[in-house]
Amino acid sequence: MVSYVVALPEVMSAAATDVASIGSVVATASQGVAGATTTVLAAAEDEVSAAIAALFSGHGQDYQALSAQLAVFHERFVQALTGAAKGYAAAELANASLLQSEFASGIGNGFATIHQEIQRAPTALAAGFTQVPPFAAAQAGIFTGTPSGAAGFDIASLWPVKPLLSLSALETHFAIPNNPLLALIASDIPPLSWFLGNSPPPLLNSLLGQTVQYTTYDGMSVVQITPAHPTGEYVVAIHGGAFILPPSIFHWLNYSVTAYQTGATVQVPIYPLVQEGGTAGTVVPAMAGLISTQIAQHGVSNVSVVGDSAGGNLALAAAQYMVSQGNPVPSSMVLLSPWLDVGTWQISQAWAGNLAVNDPLVSPLYGSLNGLPPTYVYSGSLDPLAQQAVVLEHTAVVQGAPFSFVLAPWQIHDWILLTPWGLLSWPQINQQLGIAA
């Protein structure tokens, strides 16, 4: 097959000007965030906080190194556009090889490294972003900033690995509940369980002077992280993972550091996953019962709830169920990149069980927001679930619900747990949970 390239000099000249402008925006963005991302300050004066800060600082330094390579590619690309069509084609081929080699070296470091780098890349473009304040649902909620060439450049760079960041990737590989790999993931066997498991990684809580206890509620295991000096405040933390993954190391880091820095006791329900027979019809009432038990024991003002992704689904569905049963609700709730409408994937059908996928127990986006506590919703513009957060915002406005939203530009799914920018928002979230001044 013969391929043809049609080169229009005037069009290429205009394109070169646009691309050069994009490069200027990206360069300015990278410079603007260099200090914040390469020298992340420790949240407290302790070894664990310093280690976490060093980890994210290393991520920022890696991104700056990659940005330098991309700048070389960009400069050559602009030169190629300015030249003749033949020169453009040759330069594009040469620079594509250069860019490919950079990503190839990352691939050689393993799947986990690639996943982390991809998750960090979009966040580094948010120049000047520190901490996004929430806005009430009654206000006009939009993602701060407007689409730009930098956004297109960023999204284009992520396109080859887009499936890794999408829930559809989980659907493709894990759609069948009896998949042997799903059984392995849920097996809680080391060393896999150190990264995806039903208990914190070894030594983490010992280093923080915390006590980890294992109890059960209605047949559901509950992990309790008690700090050295508890304040009497309790957080029910519901992990995400598309209803098929146990808590990750990022969840346990967040829960443990939160308990350490605030003195709140964190309770993590290990609810049955889809491959273990878990369905919305059984898990949501059990989750609501656990939260109600905590409220009965410690008082409404001392109990709050946080959930990310699928955990955000469970948190909202459980609160709606508590209202429907006439039970008190927690003092506040924080939803991080919540998956509120599970759609029609095979995983969704399995989670729904005998219920319709638009039943509020399955997809709480279709439930009532009346009677719910003050709720804070975090979402990012690059999150496939961001549209659901916008729909929730509109519903909250119509129903007059006490909801506030953080719609952050250039942020990915679960950015609060996975990126340096999320780390900056942890103190704000602790305040919203009522466990920090």
Swiss-Prot record:
* Alphabetically ordered keywords of this record: Cell wall, Cytoplasm, Hydrolase, Lipid degradation, Lipid metabolism, Secreted, Virulence
Q: Where is the active site?
A: S309, D383, H413
The opening ranks of the lineage are: Bacteria, Bacillati, Actinomycetota, Actinomycetes, Mycobacteriales
Question: According to the UniProt entry, where is the signal peptide?
Answer: none
Q: What organism, scientifically named, is this protein from?
A: Mycobacterium tuberculosis (strain ATCC 25618 / H37Rv)
Annotated region (Lipase) at 207-437
**What domain comment accompanies this record?**
Contains an N-terminal PE domain and a C-terminal catalytic domain, which are connected by a linker region. The PE domain is involved in aggregation and activity regulation. It is also required for ESX-5-dependent secretion. After transport, the PE domain is removed by proteolytic cleavage.
Identify the coding gene: lipY
User: Per the record's keyword annotation, is Repressor included, yes or no?
Assistant: no
* Name of the protein this chain belongs to: Triacylglycerol lipase
Q: Where is this region: Linker?
A: 101-206
**Gene Ontology terms, MF aspect:** acetylesterase activity; triacylglycerol lipase activity
Task: Please summarize the record's notes on activators and inhibitors of this protein.
Answer: Also inhibited by CaCl(2), CoCl(2), MnCl(2), ZnCl(2) and MgCl(2). Inhibited by several hydrazides compounds. Stimulated slightly by SDS at concentrations up to 2 mM, above which the activity is severely inhibited.
Q: What reaction is this protein's catalytic activity?
A: a triacylglycerol + H2O = a diacylglycerol + a fatty acid + H(+); 1,2,3-tri-(9Z-octadecenoyl)-glycerol + H2O = di-(9Z)-octadecenoylglycerol + (9Z)-octadecenoate + H(+); an acetyl ester + H2O = an aliphatic alcohol + acetate + H(+); a butanoate ester + H2O = an aliphatic alcohol + butanoate + H(+)
